[in-house]
Amino acid sequence: MVFTAFFFFFTFTGTTNILAHTLYGIKHAVTATLHIVMGHIQAVDVCTFSTPSKLLRFGFSAMFGFGARTLALAEKHRWMPSSQRKDFAFIKTLADLKPEECELSFLPLQILQEDTHEKDGKDQWQKIQGHFLNVSIMAIPCLCSMAPRGLAPNTRLNNGSMALIVVQNTSRTEFIKHLKRYTTAKNQFNFPFVETYTVREVKVQPRLKSGPDAQENVCLSAEGSYPWNIDGDLMKEASEVHVRVHPQLIDLYGVNTDDLESSQVTCSCI
């Protein structure tokens, strides 16, 4: 139970507090305290992030591409006030919108639910390769003030799966329309350039750029890594990242807020 209590206090340190919003429905210390007093315990799925050689960290959500580059730019301007820093990074990254070339390998959830041997499952990996504006991997709904339905409304706290959300390369105008949908009750995935999958494992392998954008490889080589947004924390990694969900790995104080009434908010930065 000491481990559980530690995570309760940790949830309020992130930028968007997605875990606090998902567990309590609101970012409110008194509400969280009441859940502890009343003994509300909720099992939660957790992801591991690793390379072929080492474990990187644990987490609940990840973004590669736009979401990660926005955070990386914001971290370089920590001298700015928090709200201004986030708006500046968002607008600057959106103005310089570029796709990431990478290969995604994933194991669909239904494959592991079939009565097959583990060795057969290795042949069931699916792959997609291309240029993506953003790749999101979410083990929980990821509710927050800017996304009342959640960044991944089709997943749950403890159903043993992850939502893989792939945004293909498209125009800036269409991408903004997709982002604005998160702030409403409309389906943010109802676009031809957005693909969603329910998975148990994902491998993300960045590819070096070719053609006119090849000069960006020099900058990436100098930095030695690609940015990742893990629960609002910046992580940099140069090699393939393997994300795996571990069903109901930990117990946290809180409840399942899946049945909360949907609400609408407005976004001041779009």
Positions of PLM-derived features:
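Catalytic core of DAGKc-family lipid kinases
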Residues: M1-C142
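ATP/nucleoside-binding phosphotransfer catalytic cores, i.e., glycine-rich phosphate-binding loops
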Residues: K127-Q129, P148-I270
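Flavin (primarily FAD) binding-site architecture
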Residues: S145
